[in-house]
Amino acid sequence: MKEAITDEMMMQVLSTTQVYTLVVLRKGSKYGEGNAQQIIWEHVRRNLSLRADGLLSIVCPVKDDSEMAGIGIFDADAEQTKNIMDNDPAINAGVLVYEIHPTRSFPKDSLPE
């Protein structure tokens, strides 16, 4: 780090945060059954549409042996995000379940290439 982060610098940067909503997806009771993969495919299609519309800023599928299936960060408040998730095909089919967590972050932050 080239310079020390002062309290003034912190206050300036922190004043730029905005409201976002973090969604944590976990495997539901129907995960891995029947046509779950096709339902997940449609879930992904929907996520890509939400990304294109600017509502879903970050999408991270989790690929390990845990019950966690993924996370997403929505550029929407918790109520709007709940409405979006309640209409997700994987949620409706019981393939995935979700938790919503209101959060704040810095606009224009991104993942490195």
Identify the role of each PLM range.
Residues 1-113:
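Conserved, structured core segments of small domains
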